[in-house]
Amino acid sequence: MSEKKTGELDLTSAPIGKTMLNYAIPCIISLLVAALYNIVDQIYIGWGVGAEGNGATSIVFPLTVLALGIATMIGDGACSYVSISLGSGDKDRAHRTVGNAIVLTIICGIVLMLIYLIFMTPILRMFGATDTVSELTRNYAKRYFTWIAIGIPFYMFGQAMNPIIRSDGSPRVAMAATLAGAIANIILDPVAIFILKWDVMGAAVATVAGQVITAVISIVYLCKMKEITLSKISFKLKASLMKNFIPLGFTSFLSQFSLVLSMAAMNNMVSKYGALSRFGEGGTGDTPMAVVGIVMKFFQIMISVVVGMSAGCIPVSGFNYGAHRYDRVRELMRRLLTYEFLVGVVFLLIFEIFPVQLIKLFGNSYSQTYYDFAKVAFRIYLCAVPLDCVCKSSFIFLQSVGKPVQSTGLSLLREVVLAVPLVIILPWVFTQLFGSENGIYGILVSMPMAVVITFIVAVIIDLRMYRKLKALEGEENSIL
C-alpha cells in the first residue's frame, strides 16, 4: 500500500475530517474566487453601466462556463487519475498524465478562442442577444465578449491546472494562484470602468488581466512540482492515456456543458416570456434578463462551495480508493454528503430571507418592478438548493472513485434530460393555463422540479455505492 503525505497529513491514516478540511477549504476558496471574476464584473457594471450592462454579462456568462467545462474536464480528470496513480505507486503514469493535460488544455483554449472570435455574432444571438432585448444590451454583449474571448486560453489553463496542482499535494498554491488573479481583477475593475470610462469592455479587460496572472503562477509551480517530475516525454500526447483520464473528468464537463445548454435555453425563454410579463418594462426582456443573470451568479457562489468541497476531496478519495482503504472512502462519502446538504440549507435561508438585499449589491437605483421580480426569482428558482447540493456532490464523488458512467448519467439526467426540456415546456404550459403574462413563472419552476427528480435517483445510486464500499472493505479485511 502506497503512502502519501501532504505536509504532516498522511492521506491513508490522518483523521478524515482534518484531511477533508486541509484539501477542501483551499479548493472552496479557489472556486469562490474564480466565481468572483464574473460577480465582481457584474457588481461594478451594475453601478457604473446599468441594467443593460448586467443583461449583456448574463448573455456572455454561459460561454465562459463552456470554457470552464472543458478546462475542468481535463483538469479534474487528470487530478483523479494522478491521485489514483500515486495511490497505487505508479509515478510514471502520473507525470505523463499531467504533461498530456497541459498540452491538451493549451490546444483546446486556442481553438475555442478562435471559434468565439470568428462566430461571435451568431453565438451571442444563440445565447439571448435577440431582438427582444434592447440594441444597447446587444452592443454591450459584443464589446464584453470580444475581450473575454481573447482571454479564454489563459482562463482555461489556470482552471485546468488548479486541480492538478492540488493532486500534487499543494492545495494552498492552487488557492493562491486563483486568489492573486481575482485580487488583480477586483483592483482593475473600478479603474477601467469608472476612471478610464471603458464601461463593459473595462470589466472584461480587468478579468483577462487576472486570468493571465493565475496562468503565470500555475506555470511557475508546474516547473517544480513536489510529487511529479515533468520531462519532454510527459508532453507527448498519448491517446491511450487521454482515453483513461478524460472520462474521469467528463462529468465535470457535462455538468458545465449542460448548464450552458440550460442557460442558453433559459436566456432565450426569459427574453421571450419576460417581455410578455408584467416585469417586461418597455416591452423588452431586459429587466428579467438582468435579474436572472444575477440570481445565477449567486447560485454559482453556492455551487463554488459545493463543488469546492467535493473536488477538494478528489485527491483524498481517489488516493484511498487506489490504496484499497475503502473504510476511509466510505467515511468521506458519508461526511461529504451530509456537509453538502447543510451548506444548501444555509444558502436556502439566505436566498429566501434576503433577496432584495442581495440584488441591491448590483445597484440600488432600479425600478420597483426590478426588485419585485428579483424576490420572485430568488424564492422560486432556488427553493430546492439543499437537494441540488447533494446531487452535485454525488456527481463529483462518483467521478473521484473512477465511476464515470454513474456520475455522467446523473449529470445528464439533471442538466439535459430534465432541465432543458422543462425550461422550454413549462413556460408554454403556464401560458396556456394562466395567460401569456405568467409564462415567466414556468421558467422559474423548471429548476426545482429537475432537482427533486434527480435527487431521488442520486440517493438510490449513493446508497448502492455506499454498500459496495462496505462490501469491498469486508473483502479487504478478510484478505488481511
What are these regions (language model features)?
Residues 51-62, 141, 145, 204, ...:
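Small-residue hotspots at the loop-to-helix junctions and early N-terminal turns
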Residues 75, 147-166, 174-185, 203-216, ...:
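Short runs within selected transmembrane alpha-helices of multi-pass transporters and secretion channels
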